[in-house]
Structures are given as C-alpha cells and as structure tokens.
Amino acid sequence: MYDSIMSISARNALSRLSETVAEKGVGSTSAPQAVPAAPGASFGEVLSQMTDSVGQKLQTAEATSIQGIKGDAPVRDVVSSVMEAEQSLQTAIAIRDKIVQAYLEISRMPI
C-alpha cells in the first residue's frame, strides 16, 4: 500500500526537486552573498530531509492503520497518525507550490 502512496505526484515532484537542487548545488555557500551564511544545511539538504520526513510519516500512518484494522492499535492512535501524515503532505504540497511559483516568477524576469 505504501508503494501506491509513493506514487502521489507531490511526493515524486518533491523528490525530483530535491535531487535537482542537490545536483545543481542550489543553496550552496559558494555563491556570493551580502550577508555571511550561517553554518547549516543547504537548501537541497533541507528539501531532501523534508521529503524523507513526509515519506516516513506516510509509512508510519500506513503501519498504524494496518494495526488498527487488526485491532492492535487504538482508534485515537490511528486517527492521530493519519492526520499527522496528511498535515505533512499538505505542507509539502504548499512548499512545492511556492517553489514552482518562485521559479516561474524568476523565469519571467527580464535579463
């Protein structure tokens, strides 16, 4: 069942986006910046961590749902797990939409 969830377009789009960002080096500290960059993860790493987190929450929700169907998990845990996964997925979709919107806006800028 998790394989069918993985085919969700938002998950695939975020995965491809994080791979592209990691390959291109977008967000690396080598680019000139007006303000010194604080030590931390690059933009690509953050996106990669986010997609991994969403996938993990979807897996947890699926496992909890299966336990609930078997009668091994209380309904409250099942609902909580599914709602958390849904919220993570909605957040990922919103971030994807903002990234696409920013890309389109930048691509329309005159050079």
Curated annotation (Swiss-Prot):
Give the principal location in a single coarse category.
other
Q: Show the GO cellular component annotation of the record.
A: bacterial-type flagellum basal body
**What Gene Ontology terms for biological process does this UniProt record contain?**
bacterial-type flagellum-dependent cell motility
**Source species, domain of life:** Bacteria
Q: Which InterPro entries match?
A: FliE (IPR001624)
Q: Which UniProt keywords apply?
A: Bacterial flagellum
Q: Name one Pfam family in it.
A: FliE
According to the UniProt entry, its GO molecular function terms are: cytoskeletal motor activity; structural molecule activity
Q: Which family does it belong to?
A: Belongs to the FliE family.
Name the record gives this protein: Flagellar hook-basal body complex protein FliE
Question: What's the source species for this entry?
Answer: Brucella anthropi (strain ATCC 49188 / DSM 6882 / CCUG 24695 / JCM 21032 / LMG 3331 / NBRC 15819 / NCTC 12168 / Alc 37)
**Gene name, Swiss-Prot/TrEMBL:** fliE
